[in-house]
């Protein structure tokens, strides 16, 4: 890509840019280290969130932001859902103590289980299980295994594909699932395009079995459907059938989409994924969960079947009839939604993913990426991540908090989540890689029409409280840890040496208009030369964006560490429409607008000197994360913080 012509446009572009910021996909600052102390903005925000939830639950008529709309959840409805909410951080172990618990009267008066939920209360986690299934596969399977066609793994599918190979017609593209093109990875990414429900119990004809006096013809008349026989459903009417019977029951179902077309949620896919993993490893999924994840992370209150000991039963959250909910048999559905866990254990699980405790760091980074888009600009899909693209408050409209200038950036933060909602239980785990933190919610209620919406409402309140606080805390720590003047030894001691080099790091002083938030270089003298005034930067005070950290955990940082930053001199917006609205010359659409929305990733590391990028700055940090010196890499000279 030829960029020299666009470099010349930089001064004029900077004059026109206004609005919100789009950086690399990643943090604006190093991740915050303090989420739990009395001085932490995150802890303060959590306290405010807890007060908000307390007030909400005490008001039996309405909650915050409620109106006359019939879709608004009342406090009474929220109060009827038991839930446990908790934070965690790979940098601050005490963050896991930030929790909020509410026990509904249904659970408080239940005949079985706990009557007051806490961090060690055991919930069913429903489809959050799918995240454990994929991680279990990543820990026990090779890349070759993940990319093998299912017909080479599951014999029944191979036989079906062979038996129907000679009957291929144009109609088969619509009615025949291409099992030889579907891999375990396609199932994990929800891109297989297969039928959603594999269990025959999800079929309307099952109503005939449940109510024999109402025949299939009556059902057909009620729904306007043609007559059918219950025997057409096959032998696998519930999740406790064998894997072979299950596969035979689903292999002839028509697909929803062709493989690798568009994400389509399928419980059936994760049942098949569990079958495939078990066949490839020779282990049942329950053994993989226990040995590869639960034991490895000391998740001592997590299970693949309902716990039955006296101690665990007393901690179990049981809504409604245990046989229909909490203790319902998993069968083949274990890999789709059969696990049990607690707030405490899920904090360990979330930290382990963020910290690459079980997987190599490179494998974790590869895994925590989108594999497909949805039709929405704010949601994407991974394996099996449900990725929420959270947009921080716009600095032009955020005026309510004293930290607004630090947290209101308008930037995008990707939340890697996995939800669950089945039977009497809902759940969600939210991982935020750029902050090394996250949170979980577990909930229970027999009122299925309310439980899911309540869970999502609490998640919205949590997200809107925690994300700005994490950004503001990261900004506050960055100011303390990096802002200041860095000088060469001869400059600071006024020796007779001719070396005269210094660098000043400031906050919110960048002259990249519209992108002036965060750390920046306000002055840079190298061997007596004003580098910012030189053609390298054209008089612009660049922003500094963190790129690589040498150590992440608190234990590793105790011996000191390094963090690399890239200098950014280009204006950015978070979409081309915003660039056009800002009046940038020549922006008419997505292609003319790409220079003002994604110029950083297009031009990063463009200019080198002696084999090193001139935009690379490496800071030395002490055990507290505070910078002690910086090396502008191209200058090959370390400057000490004064």
Predicted stretch roles:
Residues 41-44, 71-84, 109-187, 255-268, ...:
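Short active-site loop at a secondary-structure junction
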Residues 127, 192, 443:
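Glycine-rich His-Gly loop
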Residues 1-22:
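Fungal secretory targeting signals
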Residues 23-106, 327-642:
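Catalytic loop of the DD-peptidase/beta-lactamase superfamily, centered on the K-T-G motif
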